[in-house]
Amino acid sequence: MTLADHSPRCRFALSIVQQLRAAGFQALFAGGCVRDQLLGKTPKDYDVATSASPDQVMDLIGRHKTVPVGAAFGVVMVPGSHPSEGAVEVATFRSDGQYIDGRRPSSVRFCSPAEDAQRRDFTINGMFFDPLENQVLDYVGGQADLQQQVVRAIGDPVARFSEDKLRLLRAVRFTTTFRFRLEPATELAVRAACHQINQVSVERITQELRRMLAHPERAHACRLLLQTGLLYAILPELMNTAGTETQTSADLHARFHMLQHLQAESAEAAWAILLQPLLQPAAADQHNSLTTVDSLLKRLKMSNQEIAEITWLIAHRTALTGLPQQPLHFIKPLLAHPCSHLLLAVTEATHASQNSNSEDARFARNFLAAHSTAQLDPPPLISGNDVIARGIPPGPRIRTLLESIRNAQLDQLITTREEALQLLQQQIAR
């Protein structure tokens, strides 16, 4: 393999390898960056594996230029001098001791590259590349599995997943995002250990799900999560949402079909589709249903913005139905919302999955194209002070009057402040 990436990130990582090699240490690119280059993809970041100890790495590169993020595990971070260079993780070749928390080893022993490869998760991630000699070092059969498009655990899959439970989700993500196959023994090990996924921190689980749901292969990911038992282990709320196991399965697969048609690369839009079964059919009470969704998202420790966007999309999931017949004061605020483009994508995915008419979505897209943000959400013509100044005491009537004037403005019945004040006076006099 010839190094084809000439980005600042690659050049920076290469400079670290050159420094280490010049000092007499072994240094290689490792893991995902090797996999990506063999696949013809540009790596997002670079990891370097070396025979140098963390102290030797910091002494060589400069302690003021390094961050010992996991020195006890042989890991040092080297930030670039410019944002375009990113940061390179430099790890000493190591063999891990016993895993006691399902995530990190209790101890490490520095070793050779061949031994280091055995501790890694999957064969496609277990290769090294010598950028100075343009040579791939493959001790685990990763190149063959890349060619055969297989995700296979290194060594005993049961042991690999026992060491680090997050690998259960990573197996699904790599399989689906690369459009590979999950090797049978590896899949059996995932199924057997699926309920252990909750030993991993919620934040890490959510991050893996976020990455899967934002990817175009999200439907494939959800099907494999269901097939391996991980979906219900992480989201037990989705069990029996349609009354019976058969109905629930059919409804979930219908959601997966919608996800297959979702064009937006948005995890929030995907979540809105995936969680809709929580509102059907027993969840007739919209408020209580959204409370259930909100509680689930908070349990997953999503950000307030993510929760707000997902719950808005679910609450407005049918808002585009019959949109051409709605008044402008309904259409404009809906389409002015920051998530309206995602609502359109969700609606279009729903129609596409059902082979139904998407005239409402087309109308919305045309309306958005024909109206600027200022036209969709113009500044109000009057304020609450104008209402109070006309003798209306503070209370709910002020809001009612303001909404009435605002609706008239959005319906283009009034266009100036003078007209708004005149209409306000008329409504007060009624």
Where are these regions (language model features)?
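Catalytic cores of the polymerase beta-like nucleotidyltransferase superfamily
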Residues: 1-430
